[in-house]
Amino acid sequence: MVTSSQILSTLHMIDREKLDVRTITMGISLFGCVSDNEDRLCQKVYDHIARTAQNLVRVGEEIEREIGVPIVNKRISVTPAALISGGVTHPVKLAKALDRAARATGVNFIGGYSALVQKGMPAADRRLMDSIPEALSETEFLCSSINIGSTRAGIDMD
């Protein structure tokens, strides 16, 4: 049972200490979107994200109202793009599809324009990495990352 003291303490944190929930994240697998045609891949990625996350912002806002604590960011995290883009010759197309999906759903940002190269760097990873500057300059909501090492895998020195 919640006590009066706990309620007052929470109200104090919200009012005086600006308590908030920093981020809620919806994780979406894109493995079902794989295609040997990059335009089809981009369309499938957009459609899947837009459909899956269509209610994310609304639900986040409902949670804010229900618990009385602001949620600063609503975001989407997807399968690392390099894992689904083996046949893509222009990865920026995929970046733009991700960005359009973020805009359509109303989220603050979308992560997953990423490569996991801790165990080596196939051609798809290299193409994606080379495209990051262009992708970030031509999108509004996209976040990108490169994983170069882990405790288990070590660091790939190539």
What function would you assign to each model-found segment?
Residues 136-157:
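Cap/lid and interdomain-hinge subdomains that line or gate substrate/regulatory clefts
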Residues 1-130, 150-157:
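Metallocofactor- and cofactor-centric catalytic cores in central/energy metabolism, strongly enriched
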